[in-house]
Structures are given as structure tokens and as C-alpha cells.
Amino acid sequence: MDFLFSPYTLPNGVEIKNRLVVAPMTHWGADVHTGVITDAERNFLKGRAEGFGMFILAATLVARGGKSFAGEPHAICETDLPSLKERARIIHAQGAKAVLQIHHGGYTALNDLLDGMDKIAPSDARDMTIPEQAPQGNKAGTRAATEEEIEGLIHAFAHAASLAIEAGFDGVEIHGANGYLLQQFYSGASNRRTDKWGGTREKRMRFPLAVLDAVLEARKESGRNDFIVGYRFSPEEPWDDGLTMEDTLALIDELKKRNLDYLHVSLHDFFAMARRGGKPGVERIRQIHERIDGTVPLIGVGGLVTGEKIEQAATSGWAEFIAVGKAVMANKNLAILLKEGRLDQIRTEIDPNNKEYYGFPAYLWELEGKGLAFLPPLKKGKKN
């Protein structure tokens, strides 16, 4: 485990004390309508950053009409600053760098939380080729964003970054993964435009790159050269016209030209092989790491729920940082267990009889009971 607990200096000169990262975890803990921090969110954050080098907070909304989760935090306007400042303080008090993930859901936005706004995405719902049964299949009522709205969204991401700077965060992570707005613009399945924002790979890439450039400009204007800017992406989509490994590698070629501090690949399985494009029979993350070629550090994540899997990922040589989500949901003291070599004490299940320890908001407990794949399973025979 020596690798995991060695320091790393990012391209902007900021040293991260170790290679362990808490992945962004949706907690449904902020106020449903205002995004203000609540006691439920405070309890969830308490203790989970201990021993980690960096903690990436849950997806945080940059503009009204893009909320994909009830209880999603906000970074929209100055009234959000008190809650943002408190979140940063909570993480800093535990000794980790605090990074805010900035997000817009596009067509995945919840219809009952649009705040009177239209649901917008790259294209009208009827033009998309994403299957209705897809995980992000909630396209009903979506219309194509206008040019003015696109420019407004770019500004919203930059403004959210400025709010994060003012709130005392160490950085932001631009959420370009998991089927949300930035990925929707890059995917040929959801972006059917024929203007400057779509039609070819290069034009589909324009919006996510414009968002990144605007965030980097916000950092420059702030004078905070030590402010971390990262970008999260998903490597493939399973449906026709969706993203392939070739698309992802082309995006990486452009991202690594920018003044980024890290890239973060979102995977369900760290060791999964490429399905569409790229080198057959070669792990996605390995292909991505080779393409980056040392120009920017990579965070790897995906199914690392046991000490053995975390150790295997750490020694693979395919990522400079290792992120965990489900493992730290089940083990608040995960970093300590790893550092002390107590791998056999890492829990992979949630004990519903010990709710106070986990600090989950009520809705998260409700989802736990449904056995959803993105959450640690409940301990068998223990459910009350």
C-alpha cells in the first residue's frame, strides 16, 4: 500500500498528501428545493474524508432546470455561498483537499424539480436515438437548447467555479460523465444537431471543451493558480450512435492540451475491457492511461470494494490516483484500514441495524432497501 500513501504534485504545483480519493457520491442530503446544506448532509460528510488526499463532493447544480437528484446541492448564485463554505470547511477539518463537482443533468433533469424551466439538452427528445429503457432514458419533454441557452450554460459552469473559489474549495471537477449534459453534447446518440455544436465529432466536442475553457478562464481571472480543475468522463455508451473508445481517446487528445490538473474516468469496473472500439481485449483504463501518456494524472475508479481490489488497482500502474465510493460508504475509516493493512476488516455490506454509524439521509436508506447496483448491498438477514 506504499503507493496509495505517497504524495503527488499536480500540474499546478499543489501537493496531494496521498493517492486516495473519495469519489463523488450522490447522497440526496441537501434541501430538495434550495440545495442548502442540512443536518442529513452534514452527517453523511462527517468522517468520510479522514485519511484521504482528496474528497470530491457530490454533483452540484450549476443552473436551474438541470437537477438530476432530489437533494442535489447548488452552486448557482451568491445565496449558495454559506452552504458551499460550510461543505468546504467540513472536508478541510478532516485533512483532505475539497473539490466540488459541478453538474447539469440535461435531459436527465427531474420533471418535478425544473423550477418552471424547460428541460433542455443538445437535441429534442424525439430526435435522440437513446433507447427509452436506458438508465438515463428520461427524455420526455426535452427540447433542444438554443444558442443563447448554450452560451448561458457555459457561463453557468464558469460562475459555479467562481463560487467554489470564493467558498474556499481547493478545486472543481467538471462532470462530463454518466450521461449528463456535457456527455449528451459529445454523444452522437443524444446530439443530433447540425449547427456548430453538432454533426461531427469535432463539433460535438465543442460544448464540453467550451465549458472547460470557461472554467479555466474563471480560475485565471481569480488569480488562484493553485485552484484545481479536473474533468470526469465516461469512456463508452452501449447503444447505436453512442460514444466509443475512439471517441473517448479523441476527447482525451483535446483535454490533455488544456491546463488541466487531472482527468477522472468513470467506470463501473476498474478492470473492464473495451466493448466498442479501441484495442480489443485491453482494459479501458489502460488504453486511456496510455493515451494520456503522462501529460496529466488520471483518477481511476470502479467496483473497488475490497482491500484486495483496491491494492490490485493501485499496483496496476494505470492511474495516479485511486478513487472509492461504495467502499467509503460502508467504511468511514477506510483510509485507516488500508494504511494499517487491515484489509480483512473492510466491510462490503451495509448493516441496517447500525444506521447511526453510516449517517445516510432517509432517502438513501430507502434506496439501499431496493438493492440498487450503485450502492453497497444490505447485509443479508439483518434488515429491520
Residue ranges and their predicted role:
Residues M1-N384:
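Flavin-dependent oxidoreductase catalytic cores
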